[in-house]
From Swiss-Prot:
Cofactor note (record): Binds 2 magnesium ions per tetramer.
Cofactor: Mg(2+)
Stored HAMAP family: Phe_tRNA_synth_beta1 (MF_00283)
S-S bridge residues: none
Domain B5: 423-498
Protein name: Phenylalanine--tRNA ligase beta subunit
SUPFAM superfamilies given in the database record: Anticodon-binding domain of PheRS, Class II aaRS and biotin synthetases, Nucleic acid-binding proteins, PheT/TilS domain, Putative DNA-binding domain
FDX-ACB domain segment(s): 724-817
Enzyme class: ligase
Keyword annotations of the record: Aminoacyl-tRNA synthetase, ATP-binding, Cytoplasm, Ligase, Magnesium, Metal-binding, Nucleotide-binding, Protein biosynthesis, RNA-binding, tRNA-binding
Complex formation: Tetramer of two alpha and two beta subunits.
Pfam family, one: tRNA_bind
Amino acid sequence: MKFTLSWLKQFLETSSTVIEIAEALTAIGLEVEEVIDKAAELQKFEVAYIASTKPHPSADKLKLCDVETKSGMRQIVCGASNARAGIKVVLANIGIEIPNGKFKIKESIIRGEKSCGMLCSEEELLLASESEGIIELYEDAVVGENFTKYYGLDDPIFVINVTPNRGDALGVYGIARDLAAKGIGILKELEIPEIKSTFTSKMKLNVQDKEACPLFTFREIRNLKNKPSPDWLRKLLKNVGVKTISSLVDVTNYISYSFGQPMHAYDADRIKGGISVARHCEKCSDEAISGQQKEIAAAALQPRNDVAKFHALNGKEYLLTENDLAIKDESGIQGLAGVIGGAKSSCTDSTTNIILEAACFNAKMVAASGRRFQIDTDARYRNERNIDRNFTEKALDIATNLILSICGNGEVSEVVKFGEKEPQKKPLDFSAYYLEKITGIKLSIKEIEAILNELGFITDVKGEIIKVIAPSWRHDITILEDIAEEITRIYGYDKIESIKLPELDQDNNKLREYKRISSFKRILASKGYDEVVTNSFMSSEDAKLFAELKEELFLLNPISIGDNYMRPTILPNLLSIVSKNLARSIKDMAFFEVGPSFIDLNTEATYLTAIISGSYNNKNPHSLGRGYDIFDLKGDLELVVDYAGLSIDKCIATNGTALPQYYHPTRAVNIGLGKNLLGHFGQIHPKILKYYDINQEIFAFELNITNLPLIKAKFGKREEFAVSDFQANFRDYAFIVDQDHRVGEIISYINNFNKKLVKSVILFDIYSGDKLPESKKSIAIKIELQADDRTLTEADLNLFSQDLIAAIEQKFQGTLRE
């Protein structure tokens, strides 16, 4: 939306500067994209007069123009087709920079002839995107006068971005009303002189679809002189980019930009029989039409080969469909309602009698027709954002008065009208309490009422409640929040006090839990896992393989038949992903998910669930790789549990809790802490794999993060890892122990046996068989020994071996295998 400062001041009494107005517009939600001051760039251009012309002796398309300027006569070579003697033009003197092209004018020799300046076109001055010749000024222009002042370019232009809900801001009057409410000035009252009709129009009006056209008004005006528009009107329209055509057309454009009400002027002598508004192929119903109206409509809608063809003002022809609303007479279509007028009935310089139309059309129909034919007009832009029906007749009167004042005191008919004004909207109960509740703004009822009244709202205060009725031009005000928004934008968003957010408590358990889960994810990602996110719903058929079905976990309104149950574990979803990957020949997988599992209606736990399958090192071109095994999974789980401040060996549950049925009975274990079950890890049962059509081993762990204790110390700084400068030594041992001793417990004991020397303990063999008693097993380990302060001697190593063997014998009744 464009408008000038002088245009705004027609409706707003203000002494505010351009900058103050621009800032206020943006503050109230009418964002100023640009303020154009063309006078600054074109200040040095002046009015000149072509006294005579003659052909260039060496170029057919050039002319030698004798130009009268402020400083005297000079010769200028010009190639414009409209350059001729007797016209006022725009002169660029030597040294001036031309905006389009950014080049400076120099005294030059063109084909042997001297040229001292340049005669300019609108395109060269960036006043139009294209032009056919040099600018021709009216006779009242004075030679030597500043061009910007004469042309009205000393009037700053505001370019604002209007949101789709603010159709009322597509008129300068609506913008002035908002600025007045903001305190930028005082809104001037519209003075509309009463129009007395001098004859009764014989033009009949028939509107068949009230929903498509809720209001249609027109009046006839006769004996006019369609002369050029006055200077003030031409300047206003030119400054906002509207081409001036004639006074009749210019007035309709002025009303559209001033009040947001599109208008159209038909040449009355070209309208035959009356006006009908209908979809172009609709048949007339006896109920809707009677008498002479029936004859008019029948003629207008009579099937003909060219009835759907429409010749528009833009020179193009369109074929209308049954979805397009047309304005017709007996001879055919005269306009595409709300979008563009027709060429047949357009006003020309010789037009003396007109039909002046102001109407409201269905916004959706206008938008659909405009999109279908790709026609962008000011009328469409305003109509598809809804028109204020209660102002339409006023706009018709204002336009009539303007036409009569410019084109002579012609004869005027009464208003021919279909439809009624929009009924008053229902009141909404608003209060200062509600405003403060949703915006934080504290205002009294009187202050709220004052703002709303300035914006045109009707208010009625009843104690602490203010009944608010939105004005007819605000179609977007339907709920209390809309009213609060209106008050807030006028009060000022910048006045709302900022509230400092409370600092996060770093000791807060929720924050610590969030950080811990994030760390778990980073740990697994660093080990090559991919994170997945799956649905919390699953098929009850799948769920019963993993847990006993419970009635309360069935969904009453599942999004699909296959998602009718709350998942008891994340594993089924991950197994489905494995199955889909295998079907696409992707065999090597490692991924995890953190999400909820549902035990019953009142129990929900957050689980970290991970799966590995396939080969570990498949991407190394120098290695065939090896298949994942349970120790790979245990190592990754150990990293996670270690970060949580626990030891994996201490978390192997020994409380007799049965493994879930979907794990392999002898290749999986529970994870727990005392009596608190934390999860499970191991190999998935072959029956489950068969159900999911998986033909390779799957290893998985499930860790109940909800039950995992938060150990504060683990979030502190870890000790710096020191690397010894002395040589490491390795010793292998094989101990015979009872079958019921857990290997992990023995390795953990050795790791802590002598922390100053033991750097690592690696298990490389477990044996039980014919050479050992049935109740015994042999475990073979490699121990890395290294001191931080010296190189270990043979005596040191022998002493360590003696002490270790004795300790194993005492702790586990183990003996060194010969």
